[in-house]
Amino acid sequence: MTKSLSEQLFETAEGLLPGGVNSPVRAFRAVGGVPRFIDRAEGSRIYDIDGREYIDYVGSWGPMILGHSHPQVVEAIRKAVERGTSYGAPTPGEIALARTIIEAFPSMEMIRMVSSGTEAVMSAIRLARGFTGRDKILKFEGCYHGHGDSLLVKAGSGVATLGIPGSPGVPACLAELTITVPFNSNEAFRKAVDRHGKELACVIVEPVAANMGVVNPRPGFLETLRELTRKAGIVLIFDEVITGFRLAYGGFQKLCRLEPDLTCLGKIIGGGLPVGAFGGKRTIMDFLAPNGPVYQAGTLSGNPLAMSAGLATLETLRSRRDDYAALDRRTADLCAAMGKLFRTAELPVRINRAGSLFTVFFTDSDVFDYETASHCNLERYARFFKGMLDRGVYLAPSAFEAAFVSFAHSDEDLEKTLQACAETIKTLGGNP
């Protein structure tokens, strides 16, 4: 049997790249089969090198809220690249993008550009430690904040996908400085602050967890974090790498009306190009070099291509800020229709949604933290993923990731997705 081009390329890649990929979840280990090698993308669609077309709900893991190859973003990149790819010097674009982000996030008075969400988080934590003079940090089980050493303890995303409790290579002394408590547990958080509060530099949280699948904060949870960190002099960091500009123009903090001390952003603020940023109160940000003693630097920080793509993306989103509600409703309608198909087939699922993000958990129990997420039926999700893929719908190749609906998804796309879902359910033993 003739192998597909994706199969041939993957065999070659396995001899050149660990696991054949440059990020573990792409290897399809959790769902089986061969990863699709993508040739191009436009709007709501991606196309693999074998010529197959898919309705894309991965969206480069979130930033493609406008759809792939958006004309204004592409044009901004084209104009920027004609002027040079990187200077290693300040550019006007840095100021324009910084001002745009700060105007959207009242909690930010200053911002520092970096090259990835991971780098933003690592730098924000270093800054919090330098500002407070404390060493310990607190994170929540199942929340993923990039692959920084201190943050791989009980993490989500690819760590959860591969079933890894942490990661070899992370020194025990670093892990000991990371306190973990269950997401959505006010009681556990209070106990941790009571015990470690005087040693904690920061508390970092995804305000909506999106890397153990989508898990919303319970009422009062984030408010408790804000109250107790403020009382204990602990820096509160919102990791909005996924939720920033995705759930609202101004991030989830605009919706929950809470202001963290620091915010981490990524992905979307570069229009899908490599970028990240962290920002917050001037009193904290002034501790960064060259103003202060906390060192952070990067050759490609604020590079002109990412700044141009990011500014074009955010300007477009700003002009469409009133359209977020409609996008949320369309996503809610899609999730409701999918839920009805599963119920008719008597297949136990929980579909968690936050704005235009959602996750299908194959479980008969509510999912509100990492423990409950980990009880979902991974084998059934893998079969669901493959069935949808075979029918032209590209979902995350992991049960612990989010699906993303974009402004580019049409009514026809959603109808085709539901049809694919109905057909796939039949292969899972259902009869909708």
UniProtKB/Swiss-Prot annotation:
Q: Which cofactor does it need?
A: pyridoxal 5'-phosphate
Tell me where in this chain the PTM N6-(pyridoxal phosphate)lysine is found. Answer: K267
Task: Tell me which stretches of the chain form a coiled coil.
Answer: none
GO biological process annotations for this chain's record?
protoporphyrinogen IX biosynthetic process
Q: Name one GO molecular function term.
A: pyridoxal phosphate binding
Pfam families according to UniProt: Aminotran_3
The record's principal subcellular location, in a coarse class, is cytoplasm
GO CC terms of this entry: cytoplasm
> What residue range is the signal peptide?
none
Q: What class of enzyme is it?
A: isomerase
**SUBUNIT field:** Homodimer.
Q: What is this protein called?
A: Glutamate-1-semialdehyde 2,1-aminomutase
Source organism per entry reads Syntrophus aciditrophicus (strain SB)
